[in-house]
């Protein structure tokens, strides 16, 4: 006898007639007049539960099996048999069943068989992994994460763990969470009346990071090809379906690389990850296609078979101005393209993923390489049909004098970036990288439109439960 996951049984890894033990939770129980109960038991290893056929000859049939309800945890031992019913190839003829955990009050169990709205499930984030939709999201999220790590490993990249606590504002936007151990009721003050951060834990102001990029660049300028994959934080007071205060970012950084190089890297990475989901998690994708967004499978298949289009920002603006479509936000050179503009380009004009590049410098960060025209920077966004921007990246400014000029233009103190400037003083090289918002990727793959439903415990304005 062996411990078996539900997924391993369905994959045929246990011969018909072999005895296995499956451990999981009851989804439903159905009793027949013939004295047999049918238990649907799931363990999270795949989308479908396994059916346990439980005869009334079991010693605990009357006093336990017939009292099982949704959510009870069980250990079932039995023989693997071919299932005569439709929908699954194998089931379990149960010879022994142990109840390891009861649901105290089945009438008040929040995850009972009735269907809940996705909004209601957010209030029950500690129990929502037990539902079909959130369980499927979790498996797809894991598949994407593993695929991304695998992709970079196969491409010879080194994973770098960048710090979550920082003194630098990567984006220069100022929307950062402060990290402090000072007594909020009795703050130390300087002679000018300002908060004296010399008395704080780090002896200076410290924040939660908005990006691992700047730290990642230091390792790329020594190890050539690196990537970071970790949580980032934005204190942006946005209560929308597209924003989180805490989210995960994938940020590769490549020495001796140009904007064109990382555009190619972005395309290869996305196609690799999407192929992994199509190969490994089709059961979950079929659920999303049936209940969330009927286009998810077709969209991913189309994505991996499409060549990425490329267009300069200036040309993209021209396309938008001449398309004859009325946008909510008017288009003019110098604006940051909104979601409606991005989606028009990807879905209606190019009908494919598209890389928009060479943006106006005034709407981009200080570290992006200034182009020869003095007006634009070597920046790019990857736009995907169905969602818009999914990746943002750039070639970094490797020239110290130009970097200092950009810091001054954005009213940033270059002394705060002394270590970042050192990279340009000691063996500077052209280098480039991008950032992928991981939750936005999961949203795109699953069709689950609210980003708060694709991360286990969402953090947003006024939302920090669990």
Curated annotation (Swiss-Prot):
Keyword field: Aminoacyl-tRNA synthetase, ATP-binding, Cytoplasm, Ligase, Nucleotide-binding, Protein biosynthesis
InterPro entries per the UniProt record, alphabetical: Aa-tRNA-synt_II, aa-tRNA-synth_II, aa-tRNA-synth_II/BPL/LPL, Asn-tRNA-ligase, Asp/Asn-tRNA-synth_IIb, NA-bd_OB-fold, NA-bd_OB_tRNA
CC annotations in GO: cytoplasm
Major location category of this protein: cytoplasm
Annotated HAMAP family: Asn_tRNA_synth
Family recorded in the similarity comment: Belongs to the class-II aminoacyl-tRNA synthetase family.
Record's protein name: Asparagine--tRNA ligase
UniProt organism field: Shewanella sp. (strain W3-18-1)
